[in-house]
């Protein structure tokens, strides 16, 4: 069966950051998980940790093994949900369409699902059932995105914090990290009339990618030289530890807003004790009304039928897959009957043209009835009547006398 293990929706960030996955160990995790699972996809983003897998049964021993592989404390088991079969499948489809994103309808999740899928595919960590599930879910996400036209009102944690900071008249910025979220943040910032932005990174070669004169690329270790002169700091690193500590922020100076888009968090919560500083983590940010939330919800809700359509197509594929062995058996029987009939005819007829004509007619007739039987079998399977249909078809075509 297919199942998904993930973190419950309302789990506080203090717990979520203890249940994250180290991206640089992705392949290592897959190898270890495959000792216990038949197929697995790890979906790990800055705000989501989910493991989709195929297994014969789920028990607490298996869950303990999974926790052990990720180095999670089993005392956090109560914050984990597990869905199986249809619930798990529906959850994935809803994820790819943006229904479960912290910021409703954000447009990054589909790309993140695709990346996770291809990592498992390249690592040969997928069985056919899980592979086909992700193929249908990704196709569904693409169709949902294009038909609902959410790209007309794009939203992400990056776009929300940039718009908020601009509305608060911030002009001098610092961005920490230049991964997917960091790049997006820089893109949104540079689209506005800002004075300057310091980009703190560990790889200074990134400087060659950015031509905008407002951007100062600095070494990550230099950030504290400039951080107290900023109006706004946006942190989005993949560090497993705090990167902005309370002692890094001066008590005296103009107001500073710090947005922490990372999980685990980049920013020390105690900075909120400094009068001039305001810290917003990803949970706070997700509650900001970006002005388009209602519009996105309405667009998504009116196009939910797309999700149901592709989900049903996957279920149909799964049901039809159950009769695949019978279809192969029927094809073998059809070929045996054809060979037997044409051999009998050849033994009684010496005219080559007659034999060729008979060969085509017998093959055509055999294929017609075989394909018709397969079509009927598929139709009845989707109606739930496959057992009775199978018995009748076997009785007509496959009972040897």
Curated annotation (Swiss-Prot):
The record marks 91 as: Important for activity. One of its GO terms (biological process) is protoporphyrinogen IX biosynthetic process from glutamate. Pathway: Porphyrin-containing compound metabolism; protoporphyrin-IX biosynthesis; 5-aminolevulinate from L-glutamyl-tRNA(Glu): step 1/2. Keywords: NADP, Oxidoreductase, Porphyrin biosynthesis. Its EC number is 1.2.1.70. The active site is at residue 46. Substrate binds at residues 45-48, 101, 106-108, 112. It catalyses: (S)-4-amino-5-oxopentanoate + tRNA(Glu) + NADP(+) = L-glutamyl-tRNA(Glu) + NADPH + H(+). It holds the Pfam family Shikimate_DH. The keyword Iron-sulfur does not apply. Disulfide bonds: none annotated. Homodimer. Possesses an unusual extended V-shaped dimeric structure with each monomer consisting of three distinct domains arranged along a curved 'spinal' alpha-helix. The N-terminal catalytic domain specifically recognizes the glutamate moiety of the substrate. The second domain is the NADPH-binding domain, and the third C-terminal domain is responsible for dimerization. Belongs to the glutamyl-tRNA reductase family. During catalysis, the active site Cys acts as a nucleophile attacking the alpha-carbonyl group of tRNA-bound glutamate with the formation of a thioester intermediate between enzyme and glutamate, and the concomitant release of tRNA(Glu). The thioester intermediate is finally reduced by direct hydride transfer from NADPH, to form the product GSA. This is Glutamyl-tRNA reductase. It comes from Clostridium botulinum (strain Eklund 17B / Type B). The gene is hemA.
